[in-house]
């Protein structure tokens, strides 16, 4: 008989031939993640109107080229009637605070620095789509993620004030913005800022894991992939919070199928870390026990769940057969887990979903290596 490697090569070649289809590109909402593209447009209309108004206010102060919004892995907050803003880039680990105030710019910059350092760990009290001031109370969101000039974490007003004075005296920079001068400072985050943020949610993740029988490492990997542990995360897809839950789809499913209630979660509900992690993990429970319950091998099931969280159950099944869902499930179940992984990362109709599964599985490995004694 030929060696085992020969049969492995034949099998791999067969899989490639079976799934070597020129798929048309789709988006995250094309395959069962949203009910209809038209519904998606309707759902995001209010958000679009809000952002259009918001961007108009930004352009008046900063110009067309300097419009910045909060996203999945960056926090952007305007204050001071749009004259000042802060951006926290959670992937780069860098905080940029700047002002274009024409009068007393250093005073305005100091206020923006203090506000940023003391912004509370409560997204419900921070309006990302206005220049509304932030009520500074409770533990700061950036606590232990930023250290002052004495290498101390910043929790209280006196320390934030002192650090702001230090930054303005030593680190202030200027640049031209729309024919105006902007004054800004850059603050590096601590090296382990990812871990510092993840620690904040350890108890919530543990509870959700036990409640829905979804592994902790998977929940952590999803959060890191979706938001970089940014509870303020918001995306063009009308997704909110740590696990980037879309209210109209995953949120509505969880309310109906798990919580036995009508309607869908509000953005405010999903900005709450406890609610968000519970809802996102509950959706994995639905994927596991309802939409993908026929997947037989537990590892193949997990790969399918991860892919479906991003690209919908339909996207998973279309990877194996575009016209016959029952046959798609049979084909999926005929493969070994590594072959299912190969198909979902090479032949899924959505490029984003292909990359997504790779990212999540890599972050899972990273999490487990960090937590192995």
Which ranges hold each PLM region?
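Cell-wall glycan-active module
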Residues: 1-224, 289, 293-296, 322-373
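Short amphipathic alpha-helical segments at helix-loop
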Residues: 186-190, 261, 265-272, 297
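Active-site metal-coordination segments of metallo-dependent hydrolases
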Residues: 193-196, 267-277, 351-352
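Short, functionally critical alpha-helical segments immediately adjacent to catalytic or ligand/cofactor-binding
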Residues: 213-234, 245-246, 280-281, 305-310, ...
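Secretory-pathway/luminal and periplasmic proteins that interact with or process carbohydrate-rich
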Residues: 227-236, 252, 311-323
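Active-site-proximal structural scaffolding
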Residues: 235-238, 298, 353
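Substrate-binding/active-site groove segments that recognize
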Residues: 236-264, 278-286, 332-335, 360
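Catalytic and binding regions of secreted/periplasmic enzymes and modules that target cell-wall glycans
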Residues: 276-326
């Amino acid at each position: 008989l030929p060696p085992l490697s020969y049969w492995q090569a034949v099998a791999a070649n067969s899989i490639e031939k079976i799934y070597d289809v020129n798929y048309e590109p789709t988006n995250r909402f094309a395959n069962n993640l949203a009910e209809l593209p038209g519904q998606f447009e309707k759902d995001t209309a209010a958000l679009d109107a809000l952002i259009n108004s918001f961007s108009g206010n930004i352009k008046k102060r900063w110009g067309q080229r300097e419009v910045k919004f909060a996203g999945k892995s960056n926090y952007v907050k305007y204050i001071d009637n749009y004259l000042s803003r802060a951006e926290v880039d959670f992937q780069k680990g860098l905080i940029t605070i700047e002002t274009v105030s024409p009068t007393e710019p250093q005073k305005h910059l100091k206020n923006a620095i203090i506000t940023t350092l003391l912004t509370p760990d409560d997204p419900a009290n921070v309006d990302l789509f206005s220049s509304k001031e932030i009520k500074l109370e409770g533990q700061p969101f950036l606590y232990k993620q930023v250290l002052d000039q004495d290498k101390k974490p910043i929790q209280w007003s006196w320390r934030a004030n002192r650090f702001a004075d230090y930054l303005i005296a030593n680190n202030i920079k200027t640049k031209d913005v729309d024919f105006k001068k902007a004054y800004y400072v850059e603050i590096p985050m601590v090296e382990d800022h990812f871990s510092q943020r993840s620690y904040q949610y350890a108890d919530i993740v543990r509870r959700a894991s036990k409640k829905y029988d979804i592994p902790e490492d998977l929940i952590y990997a999803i959060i890191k992939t979706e938001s970089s542990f940014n509870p303020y995360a918001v995306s063009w897809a009308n997704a909110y919070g740590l696990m980037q839950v879309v209210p109209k789809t995953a949120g509505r499913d969880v309310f109906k199928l798990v919580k036995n209630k009508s309607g869908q979660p509000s953005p405010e509900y999903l900005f709450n870390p406890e609610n968000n992690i519970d809802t996102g993990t509950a959706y994995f429970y639905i994927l596991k026990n309802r939409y993908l319950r026929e997947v037989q091998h537990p590892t193949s099931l997990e790969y399918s769940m991860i892919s479906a969280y991003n690209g919908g159950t339909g996207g998973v099944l279309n990877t194996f057969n575009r016209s016959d869902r029952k046959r798609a499930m049979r084909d999926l179940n005929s493969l070994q887990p590594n072959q299912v992984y190969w198909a979902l990362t090479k032949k899924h109709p959505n490029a984003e979903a292909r990359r997504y599964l790779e990212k999540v599985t890599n972050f899972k490995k990273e999490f487990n290596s960090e937590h192995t004694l």
